[in-house]
């Protein structure tokens, strides 16, 4: 049992080292992306387009074939360093403040150039709102939209605000704010671009009103895209890097991620044409997504615009507009945190953007239960404690069986040591004798390992739950723990967890191998050091789980009494395992020794009964 347990601990520790190595490599990749030649304009669309398919924005719209300077974004230098974008051309700024966001709209292109989330603190300063969209000297992440067609306005057109107001604020009694931007009339077509901000919502409706004042029918298409660089957002160090890139969802293809690296290599694979689904840009905790109405034709696209600059979006028909008629099209745009309850109600599959890794089947129910406890306590730390107690209760029968097995092993450890000493020159015979002894005493040597194996997936799933849940971002417990999603700043929880592990080792059977005994003594220190980098919420779970395990194990160990002293007479050992043994080597074997009287002192089964009666 000791050997198996050591192997499990070593495997787990090695896995953590591999994860750390992967994290280092990922950070190096982010810091030093390779220089890549200009991508083909068709990058991202993996399905051939029919003649009647929706048009894709050409170079006059997305500058996919033009010089990068067309969009105001220079190509990277020859050293392969990350691109440092120039500021995009700027016109007048329109500022909108609601109860959820602060937004800035630029009249050039009518782009949404900045969006701050009032209820989400910045990673650098808790008193500053988190900026999800921005157009700065070193970073670019904006939302663009326009119409496809000759003379129609796109994201390079200079719009004019219909109102003279440049600062809007949602006042009490108002449910929404509407911004109207007028494009210059061209070829008898008048276009008005609209933004509608809603109370208590991260959804912004972006629309176009097209009036045909000419003599010919027009058939415009509207495109909506997100443009961003490939730099990860500022965040505290995490053990495992989270996904940064695009994602698309359709009923046929389901949820698919589109890494920026695939766009760099022109190898992105996703469904381009559908009548359902959405497309998004993802980063840790937050996302932006265009959400077309169901059962309307659409074409998704994702492409590399230039070095370290990517776009993802959707194209939809804007109607068939006869002379003298007006048509309107609207596209909901979600820009906010990955709050699972809200995402589920916005669009099918949008909640899948919350990445739980390969243990989603376990992590998702864990978060549901965690949210349920939070609704009671209004404290995510207390909710984690209650979740730990629930998981411990579910595994109580398995844990009890394992601790009973370890208690029995603790009682017979001196006798096992005698068997090992007697057969130390023959490992095969020693193993056979020990297995026979386990069988006679009805002890399962692996009984203590199985509960550990079962709980490891739960531990990993909870790690991903804490890592992915924006609800735990800056969620406090008490005292110095003000962010359960980040490491303990004073390392108190990891130290307490290490102490609890040390206490657990004292309750376990002492390994007969001196090397194993030393390893077991080092393990609490090693794991404490590893947990310095883990989120405080996960360390809290481990600490509470260890405390509950210590209480359970101590109770069961007490039921079985203490281990016998080294002076306890030898137990009867198994029969002779090889009848052809040399008599000289087996003369003093336990099989030929006089039979000892069966007293409680040397009969473990009777001793168990005696301790139970006590």
Swiss-Prot record:
Residues 34-48, 60-70, 575-602 have a biased composition (Polar residues). Pfam families: 60KD_IMP, YidC_periplas. GO terms for biological process: protein insertion into membrane; protein transport. Keywords: Cell inner membrane, Cell membrane, Chaperone, Membrane, Protein transport, Transmembrane, Transmembrane helix, Transport. GO terms for molecular function: membrane insertase activity. It is a multi-pass membrane protein. InterPro entries: Membr_insert_YidC, Membr_insert_YidC_N, YidC/ALB3/OXA1/COX18, YidC/Oxa/ALB_C, YidC_ALB_C, YidC_periplasmic_sf. The chain crosses the membrane at residues 6-26, 380-400, 450-470, 484-504, 524-544. The keyword Protein transport applies. Signal peptide: none annotated. It is found in: Cell inner membrane. GO terms for cellular component: plasma membrane. Residues 34-87, 562-614 are annotated as: Disordered. The keyword Cytoplasm does not apply. It comes from the Bacteria. Required for the insertion and/or proper folding and/or complex formation of integral membrane proteins into the membrane. Involved in integration of membrane proteins that insert both dependently and independently of the Sec translocase complex, as well as at least some lipoproteins. Aids folding of multispanning membrane proteins. Belongs to the OXA1/ALB3/YidC family. Type 1 subfamily. Interacts with the Sec translocase complex via SecD. Specifically interacts with transmembrane segments of nascent integral membrane proteins during membrane integration. This is Membrane protein insertase YidC.
């Amino acid at each position: 049992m000791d050997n198996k347990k050591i192997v499990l601990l070593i495997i787990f520790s090695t896995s953590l080292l591999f994860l750390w190595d992967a994290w280092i490599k990922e950070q190096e990749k982010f810091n030093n992306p390779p220089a890549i030649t200009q991508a083909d304009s068709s990058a991202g669309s993996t399905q051939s387009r029919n003649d009647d398919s929706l048009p894709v924005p050409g170079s006059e719209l997305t500058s996919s074939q033009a010089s990068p300077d067309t969009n105001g974004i220079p190509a990277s230098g020859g050293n392969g360093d990350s691109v440092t974008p120039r500021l995009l051309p700027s016109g007048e700024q329109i500022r909108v403040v609601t109860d959820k966001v602060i937004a800035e709209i630029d009249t050039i292109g009518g782009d949404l150039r900045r969006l701050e989330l009032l209820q989400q603190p910045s990673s650098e300063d808790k008193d500053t709102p988190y900026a999800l969209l921005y157009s700065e000297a070193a970073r670019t992440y904006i939302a663009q939209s326009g119409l496809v067609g000759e003379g129609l306005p796109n994201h390079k057109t200079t719009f004019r605000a219909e109102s003279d107001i440049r600062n809007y604020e949602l006042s009490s009694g108002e449910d929404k704010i509407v911004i109207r931007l007028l494009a210059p009339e061209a070829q008898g077509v008048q276009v008005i671009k609209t933004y509608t901000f809603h109370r208590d919502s991260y959804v912004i409706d972006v629309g176009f009103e097209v009036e045909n004042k000419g003599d010919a029918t027009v058939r415009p298409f509207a495109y909506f895209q997100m443009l961003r660089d490939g730099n990860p957002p500022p965040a505290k160090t995490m053990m495992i890097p989270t996904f940064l890139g695009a994602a698309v969802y359709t009923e046929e293809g389901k949820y698919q991620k589109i890494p920026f690296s695939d766009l760099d290599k022109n190898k992105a694979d996703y469904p381009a044409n559908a009548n359902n689904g959405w497309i998004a840009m993802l980063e840790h905790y937050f996302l932006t997504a265009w959400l077309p109405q169901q059962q309307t034709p659409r074409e998704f696209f994702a492409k590399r615009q230039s070095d370290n600059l990517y776009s993802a979006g959707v194209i939809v028909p804007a109607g068939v507009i006869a002379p003298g008629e007006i048509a309107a099209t609207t596209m909901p745009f979600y820009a906010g945190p990955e709050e699972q309850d809200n995402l589920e109600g916005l669009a099918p599959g949008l909640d899948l953007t919350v990445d739980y890794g390969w243990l989603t089947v376990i992590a998702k129910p864990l978060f549901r239960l965690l949210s349920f406890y939070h609704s009671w306590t209004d404290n995510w730390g207390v909710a984690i404690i209650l979740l730990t107690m629930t998981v411990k209760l579910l595994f109580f029968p398995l844990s009890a069986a394992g601790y009973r097995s370890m208690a029995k092993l603790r009682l017979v450890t001196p006798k096992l040591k005698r068997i090992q000493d007697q057969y130390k020159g023959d490992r095969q015979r020693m193993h056979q004798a020990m297995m026979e002894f386990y069988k006679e005493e009805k002890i399962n040597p692996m009984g203590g390992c199985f509960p550990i194996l079962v709980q490891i997936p739960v531990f990993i799933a909870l790690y991903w739950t804490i890592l992915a849940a924006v609800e735990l971002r800056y969620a406090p417990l008490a005292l110095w723990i003000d962010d359960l999603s980040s490491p303990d700043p004073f390392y108190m929880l990891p130290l307490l967890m290490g102490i609890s592990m040390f206490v657990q080792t004292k309750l376990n059977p002492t390994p007969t191998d001196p090397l194993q005994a030393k390893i077991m003594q080092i393990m609490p220190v090693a794991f404490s050091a590893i947990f310095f980098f883990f989120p405080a919420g996960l360390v809290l779970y481990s600490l509470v789980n260890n405390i509950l395990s210590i209480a359970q194990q101590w109770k069961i160990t007490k039921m079985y009494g203490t281990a016998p002293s080294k002076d306890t007479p030898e137990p009867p050992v198994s029969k002779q395992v090889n009848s052809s043994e040399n008599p000289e080597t087996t003369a003093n074997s336990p099989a030929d020794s006089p039979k000892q009287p069966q007293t409680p002192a040397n009969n473990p089964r009777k001793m168990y009964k005696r301790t139970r009666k006590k």
